[in-house]
Amino acid sequence: MVNTSEENNSNAVMPRKFQGGMNQVGHGGGRIVGQNRRALGGINQNFVHGRPYPCVVHKRVLSEKHEICEKKQADLGHRPITRRFAAKIAGSQQSYAEKTKNSNPLNLNEFGNSIAIDDELKSPEDQPEPMTLEHTEPMHSDPLEMEEVEMEDIEGEMILDIDSCDANNSLAVVEYIEDLHAYYRKIEYLGCVSPTYMDEQLDLNERMRAILVDWLIEVHDKFDLMQETLFLTVNLIDRFLAKQNVVRKKLQLVGLVAMLLACKYEEVSVPVVSDLIHIADRAYTRKDILEMEKLMLNTLQYNMSLPTAYVFMRRFLKAAQADKKLELVAFFLVDLSLVEYEMLKFPPSLVAAAAVYTAQCTVSGFKHWNKTCEWHTNYSEDQLLECSMLMVGFHQKAGAGKLTGVHRKYGSAKFSFTAKCEPACFLLENKNQP
């Protein structure tokens, strides 16, 4: 009986791990490794090729290449040398020698620069020879074009990631803050009213509304309420008056009830009804306040959660990297806008963006609106100019006339005497331009 050698017995091949995959089981119950080693065709590659950068390249003669290939072939698979495997290695070496004789002496590097090999200077002692390098012209030979490309790259990198500092703050909801504000922008128009709704009121006018809001700003400051409460109060007043006719003597009651509802929605500690009666000089009773509260909620269909300018102010101030001074000036300008009836023609997001833009111009003394602010507000400087010029006009006359509640509020030490800052009058220079 003929004894079979272990090298031809598949069961004698011990299972071992090879780079490139897991061991596979053969038909005889043993392990085969043919698909788990590197392909033999990838071993005998032409190693004479250009470097990825300009340098002196040496070439090897055929004898050195055979030594390298044989060494790699011996080390690569780490498998037993069977008769079939040895024959395959010998055949691949022979085919490699034939390809080397017919190979083209011109190779290209990764960047397209040609590298010429001079075969006439080949040394019989198998000494390495340098290869000549042909330089090509650069792609951008014009310095002006290169400068324009560089400036475009710099401008593309000006948008800052304003949420990276809050990555570890779970309350900042960095993961979906952009989606949240996109939703605010989508529904903000639901809280807007017609800028001509006062024409439908029989006993009210724009001046009466301004007096009411100016008084409520002082009440809001005396009660030391949160800033968002004031914005929601004015929003509830306008939305209610746009749907319900109110007589003049009930207008102050509408303002008190709107502030009461805003406090219940925003504040932790809500003013009691008796305090509201007291500040109204007892013009209304407890019953009047409760009845008006029911009427207002039914008229608004209990829809209280609509974005106001305050929601956008916090985000836009963060985009502007505002300090305390810039923040106070921005809120001073937006509070002045609450009093003015004509500002109802602008959506809350635009009012907030214009307040931040005008505040930056006021503090710096020149026009300032960078790419980061434009990206996060979705408003360009040209889109904000109309609203900003109106705010500058409100700032100029803030301390004059009878409605000076906002000026007195921001002229105190509590608000760092912000009302005393000079308005950005240079923005009004564009008023008469087309």
Swiss-Prot record:
SUPFAM superfamilies: Cyclin-like. Keywords: Cell cycle, Cell division, Cyclin, Mitosis. One of its GO terms (biological process) is mitotic cell cycle phase transition. Transmembrane segments: none annotated. SMART domains: CYCLIN, Cyclin_C. PROSITE patterns: CYCLINS. The keyword Isomerase does not apply. GO terms for molecular function: cyclin-dependent protein serine/threonine kinase regulator activity. InterPro entries: Cyclin, Cyclin-like_dom, Cyclin-like_sf, Cyclin_A/B-like, Cyclin_C-dom, Cyclin_N, Cyclins_cyclin-box. The keyword Cell wall biogenesis/degradation does not apply. Belongs to the cyclin family. Cyclin AB subfamily. Interacts with the CDC2 protein kinase to form a serine/threonine kinase holoenzyme complex also known as maturation promoting factor (MPF). The cyclin subunit imparts substrate specificity to the complex. PANTHER family: CYCLINS. Essential for the control of the cell cycle at the G2/M (mitosis) transition. This is G2/mitotic-specific cyclin-2. It comes from Medicago sativa subsp. varia (Alfalfa).
